[in-house]
């Protein structure tokens, strides 16, 4: 018999039903479960696949550069970043009639094009790229890196180049390498690029390899570095009248602490950014020399953890046993990595708009909205993944004997308290927030809007005031003009910060009121509920009150009938599945809030948000309905415009989303009946019955149907909102 898919599981390969295909796809990446896998092989496979991942990333970014250089308008955009629309790539579509061709021919292009809302143009411009040739050079370099990564991946699968398990479990060496070698050196290299290429570029000086050694980034060269007069590098910064990309109003400083924004570009000062990266480089280069490797000096992580037992004994054996537990569990490590990355990605979303780092990106409203939404959704998926792998850790890798009475075991011991507290918080937030919204709706519906319950967020306003926002009149800390912190700030640190925070033209510490108070608590409800489901799923992964023996059932067991007391909806996978809906729900509220707040701000009528966001009909009517009106007129009986493709995607997104429910609101028997009916009809239909298949068609399992439903729900949800967001923003602001 020929080798059938999947080769990694002989048991599945011999399955006579279509289950073979679906289970094969589902477990293709679950290396641990494959036939003949060893711990060593597992680590080596994952390690080699990382290089493949890098190759894909480099190829993708190379493609971005290449297509903009080939089909974009980078050089004309550079001449006038505020009025030329950046082109991502051309559209070649044989289905476009003349009206569509005309509608999508924009940005000075000769034919239909896609406009770029990625912020790449602004980034490339800020870091010193100016010509298409620069973009082609970057694309070729990344293509070269992609090839190198593929070769490295292949190489590390060859017997001579496969690292041993001990190499993978050498935590100190890995930490030193990542901290110093990756973060430290790359931050230092980036500082070098900013100082030698980007900052001169922002002052009208074109530095490339041919003149790299002739142009001094700072008039004094390296002198101040060696004589300890580092403050000379901060002297003579760019003036407030500096025109970015020219020498007009330019200074000579390279490392500054100005604070605030460049008045023309509305982005952080490049010299501040360079200073930040230099500081980061220093911190990480030091951090990468802290752990004990070759010379017997420095910290041992195991010793650190073992010694870390708080006095008083209230935390039991604290961190004893944790080192081996983490170091021997890939899922624990992946969970930690995903949790960290998820938080960082969400922080990127928050900081990209409030402290825009790239020149002119703050004035490109659609890009701001797209980047915020993009990073928040990605953060949501990554964070739910962290808990999924936390649950798999408990099932596959957790050993109670090794972790007796340490912090991990104690988390499991008091999981009931954790779940009940999260449950209480979610219920409290949900009922009170909904109660306030509904009350306000009733008051408006009954014609007594003055009876709404409107709560000022005074604590949040006080925090904003403490950071320097004066409009609330709190007169505290940095908003107190005669306080020592305020006066020191004038000269000592970030003098531009207080000006920026009190200007109304940016998104720093937006003015907040009762509408913000309510939506803040709605988002808090979503966050707490998502967390409750995820934490419960992980803590109950090995066993719960109803089913104390889940270990051998694994991560994603389906319903097993009523015989065992019912196993429906109690696998760790079920918790992850439910949590993704809540995560999408929450990020929906987050992005609705951000977008509505900002479009009213950008249009100069923040009172619309302030007045309409205190009741549910306001959100539905004045945000969703009002802002989709332009979008759904992208095509109509009178013709088509440049929003038509987004209008079509809006419709298509709803369709995909709704398809999800067909898979979610059904059960296994339904699918089996459907498939038997289809197979019966097929076998009795002339011509069609000439086509046979080897595998007997069996129904999707409950878990599979839910996965298909979840995938459609998620993809449709994101397609729908992406189309709405981009079309409603670009339709208003061009």
From Swiss-Prot:
Record: residues binding chlorophyll a B1: 654
The keyword Iron-sulfur is assigned to this record: yes
Transmembrane feature ranges: 46-69, 135-158, 175-199, 273-291, 330-353, 369-395, 417-439, 517-535, 575-596, 643-665, 707-727
EC number: 1.97.1.12
Binding site for [4Fe-4S] cluster: 559, 568
BP-aspect Gene Ontology terms: photosynthesis
Cellular compartments per GO CC: chloroplast thylakoid membrane; photosystem I
Catalytic function, reaction form: reduced [plastocyanin] + hnu + oxidized [2Fe-2S]-[ferredoxin] = oxidized [plastocyanin] + reduced [2Fe-2S]-[ferredoxin]
The keyword Plastid is annotated on this UniProt entry: yes
Gene3D superfamilies in the cross-refs: Photosystem I PsaA/PsaB
Binding site for phylloquinone: 671
Record text on cofactor binding: P700 is a chlorophyll a/chlorophyll a' dimer, A0 is one or more chlorophyll a, A1 is one or both phylloquinones and FX is a shared 4Fe-4S iron-sulfur center.
PROSITE patterns: PHOTOSYSTEM_I_PSAAB
Any one GO molecular-function label of the UniProt entry: electron transfer activity
Keywords, alphabetical: 4Fe-4S, Chlorophyll, Chloroplast, Chromophore, Electron transport, Iron, Iron-sulfur, Magnesium, Membrane, Metal-binding, Oxidoreductase, Photosynthesis, Photosystem I, Plastid, Thylakoid, Transmembrane, Transmembrane helix, Transport
Enzyme class: oxidoreductase
Bilayer topology term: Multi-pass membrane protein
Residues annotated as binding chlorophyll a B3: 662, 670
Location of this chain's protein in the cell: Plastid, Chloroplast thylakoid membrane
Superkingdom, taxonomy of origin: Eukaryota
Family of the protein in this entry: Belongs to the PsaA/PsaB family.
Function text: PsaA and PsaB bind P700, the primary electron donor of photosystem I (PSI), as well as the electron acceptors A0, A1 and FX. PSI is a plastocyanin-ferredoxin oxidoreductase, converting photonic excitation into a charge separation, which transfers an electron from the donor P700 chlorophyll pair to the spectroscopically characterized acceptors A0, A1, FX, FA and FB in turn. Oxidized P700 is reduced on the lumenal side of the thylakoid membrane by plastocyanin.
Subunit details: The PsaA/B heterodimer binds the P700 chlorophyll special pair and subsequent electron acceptors. PSI consists of a core antenna complex that captures photons, and an electron transfer chain that converts photonic excitation into a charge separation. The eukaryotic PSI reaction center is composed of at least 11 subunits.
Name of this protein: Photosystem I P700 chlorophyll a apoprotein A2
Organism, scientific name: Amborella trichopoda
Organism lineage string: Eukaryota, Viridiplantae, Streptophyta, Embryophyta, Tracheophyta
